[in-house]
Amino acid sequence: MNDKFTTASFLESKKQGRKITMLTAYDYPTAKILDEAGVDSILVGDSLGMVVLGYEDTTRVTMDDMVHHTKAVVRGVKRAMVVADMPFLSYHTGKNDSVRNAGRLVSEGGCKAVKLEGGEDIIENVKAIISAGIPVVGHLGYTPQSINVFGGHKAQGKTIDTAKKIYRDALLLQKAGVFAVVLECVPYKLAAFISKRLDIPTIGIGSGPDCDGQVLVIHDLTGMFKDFTPKHVKKYAEIGETVSTAVKSYIDEVKNGVFPTEKNSFKVDDWIIDELDKVRFDI
């Protein structure tokens, strides 16, 4: 458990049939908890746009946002491999921009790899980033940055044409040199088919049990939000309810004079207060 998880660890896990665990984190304390709990990899996802910054989708997340949050996560990690998302339009305008932006996430942010959404349409930029010495994770199926193209959060690969495209893109990404690929909201039989035919590991989210690993958004897994739970999520806690209950108790105790008590306060000698009572300031 003390050995650092690396790109080689991803590939070795695939060969050995060991499932890979990945979760998102966007700040130092969460990253520290996940790392100490033993998760293999931490994704600084552009999902922070929704679960941290309050946007409707991921398309408004900037490079500066990603660098800022990646820095915080990296400070909390000793073992897990940190992967950072490249945000919308940061790798679509050419090889130079793609390499420059990926380089910022590594050199400024401190992550060990970057993740990009898309297949054949971005393959040359993927190759350029890898050629620059930056490891890349692919992302196929439902790609959140394309939400306006898809018309919402929808499973992908349910027709023969879309299934062929996802499979072909996975093969192209593997040939380009990515060391893993995320499959999001892909029908589980298609995800299993692709996983068996790739030499690199697949990381599933809403894509069934036969992927080589799994990733979830930490806010979904811990039940931080009550209003919406995606179909592919299993809640392992109800942190939102716990925090809400704690805050209500705090409000009640403050208003009723229950908190704080002397136990929560610092003491000073009585004579100091007596002396202060004699002081008169010329103000």
Swiss-Prot record:
Task: Give the molecular function GO annotations.
Answer: 3-methyl-2-oxobutanoate hydroxymethyltransferase activity; magnesium ion binding
Keywords in alphabetical order, please: Cytoplasm, Magnesium, Metal-binding, Pantothenate biosynthesis, Transferase
CDD domains, per database record: KPHMT-like
Gene3D superfamilies for the chain? Phosphoenolpyruvate-binding domains
Q: One GO BP annotation here?
A: pantothenate biosynthetic process
Source organism, top-level taxon:
Bacteria
EC number(s) on record? 2.1.2.11
User: Where Mg(2+) is bound, by residue?
Assistant: D46, D85, E117
Pathway(s) where this gene product acts: Cofactor biosynthesis; (R)-pantothenate biosynthesis; (R)-pantoate from 3-methyl-2-oxobutanoate: step 1/2
Residues noted as binding 3-methyl-2-oxobutanoate in the record, renumbered to the chain: D46, S47, D85, K115
> Which cofactors are required for activity?
Mg(2+)
**Key word Transferase present:** yes
This protein's GO CC annotations = cytoplasm
- UniProt-annotated catalytic positions: E184 (proton acceptor)
Write one Pfam family the protein is assigned to.
Answer: Pantoate_transf
Which reactions are catalysed by this chain?
3-methyl-2-oxobutanoate + (6R)-5,10-methylene-5,6,7,8-tetrahydrofolate + H2O = 2-dehydropantoate + (6S)-5,6,7,8-tetrahydrofolate
Q: Any binding details for the cofactor?
A: Binds 1 Mg(2+) ion per subunit.
Chief localization: cytoplasm
**Family note:** Belongs to the PanB family.
What functional role does this protein have? Answer: Catalyzes the reversible reaction in which hydroxymethyl group from 5,10-methylenetetrahydrofolate is transferred onto alpha-ketoisovalerate to form ketopantoate.
Q: What protein name is recorded for this chain?
A: 3-methyl-2-oxobutanoate hydroxymethyltransferase
Q: What organism does this protein naturally occur in?
A: Acetivibrio thermocellus (strain ATCC 27405 / DSM 1237 / JCM 9322 / NBRC 103400 / NCIMB 10682 / NRRL B-4536 / VPI 7372) (Clostridium thermocellum)
